[in-house]
Amino acid sequence: MRLHPPQQIERFTSGGWWTGDTVDGLFRAQVSARPDAIAIVDPLNKPSLMDGAARRLTWAQLGAEADRIAAVLLETGVAQGDVVAVQLPNSVELAVTFLAVARIGAVVTPLPVQYREYELAQAIRLAAVKVLVTAERVGDRDNAEIVRRLDVPAPPIVLAWGDPARDLETAVADPAMLAAHLKGLETDPNDCLTICWTSGTEATPKGVPRCHYDWFAVESNTTAAPSLHGGDVVLNPFPMVNMAGIGGVFLPWLRTGFQMVQHHPFDLLVYLDQITEERVTYTLAPPALLTMLLRKPEMLERYDISSLTRIGSGSAPLPPWMVRGWQERYGIAVINFFGSNEGIALLSDPVNIPDPEERARFFPRPGVPGGAWPGTLAASSVKLVDPASGEEITEPGRPGELHLSGPTVFAGYLAGTADADPFDEDGYLITGDVFEIDGPDGRYLRYVDRAKDLIIRGGMNIAPAELESLLAGHPAVVEVAIVGYPDGVLGERVCAVVAPRDDVDLPSLVDFLKEKGIASYKLPERLEIVEALPRNAVGKILKRDLRERL
């Protein structure tokens, strides 16, 4: 599946923003250049996540593993362009499977391990998944068996690490089949590489296809901003299912060859242990966590974080005092990222915005007269649009919805998964995020708010409309609104605001959603009872009023 039109390819390849790089090409280059260097390290708690001991693989060992699984996939019937779903925790096995799928020219659709029957069935149907790779056990859940029992029109073949019948850890297939396949394989950087899933304001998740071209345009920024290199040790706490895990760590890893240390699920003590024991030099962390650690320095006293020189953060506004605090107290530069699966790739790094408080508040404004921003920002353009009038905003201090064009932007949603065209009449991505022009000479953008109602809990997007549509079927519910409320660790948690028909409590709502097979991270953790939901003159629920009450 080729994604971008020829004129787009010509525009960005002629400018050098898109190159011929592919995932398999960079991977093979690292295997050749540094065969004996450690490539990847499993989480310390891997035995609690899935079967199999924690491993440390060199690039040569990783290459051999990826080839072995690639041959197994071919033997199973996977062909170039077929979609392979991968539902695994951050682990060696996840990286091996991703690389094996890319090796044979198939498409990866990575699924969060929290997905249950409801979300799995949607993804399998919408992406026409041919094979699903998982672990026989994920935590205390018999995950492979759950997938095998799914009632879907075209059930995928299930391959599992830890499967008693055919364990992917030891499964072998004819390597000659792989050699023959690779000999005839023609990979184009415009080929679809992944289909990630994003929760918008619609009830159904949207599929986000991305190719090598636009993925590596993102990578050029996420590698350059923290100045990543082959000598780094990078701790990855974000699931490799979306922009943060794939664009922020996985692809820079393939570009530079640093040592990638996997972490899953997020556990603060394990996270700090890994920084200490692995001598981590760079990691990612949500702003709420960095704020908490700065306010409670005693939590860091028994850990040695002296190897850590920079941290990437984002997904929510960064408190300026926090960014300055990490710089002044620990000598650690915090890099401010603002991204999305669709291709927003704004960042503020210490080179281009040295002042830590400005770095927390501002992002470079692409296309500003006299500006000379680095990387793909130089090939990007933005406009702020008044959502009510459609007028373009050019003066500072006036909020507008961000519209974005550039080499990091995707080509459009997977067919059948979006209600509306994500692009405006000029071909700009309509982001749904509100910014203002700010700073000296209007050089910067300042984030204001989310135009959409998404809840971001621990870096995972939750669509209120999805939960609302399900809870509307609860016999005790007259009407319901789902909103987020602040949390010091996760950023936000989920609250259900219910106008009830009969007595209703939080456990009954949670049990109702669990029966639907909903992922646990989406479950409400708070219930507010109201006589009626507040609405405006045209009947729209006033969610801002509800959030203010919380």
What kind of feature is each model-predicted range?
Residues 280-285, 298-367, 381:
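Gly/Ser/Thr-rich phosphate-binding loop
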Residues 372-381, 389-422, 462, 504:
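Conserved ATP/PPi-binding loop(s) of AMP-dependent carboxylate-activating enzymes
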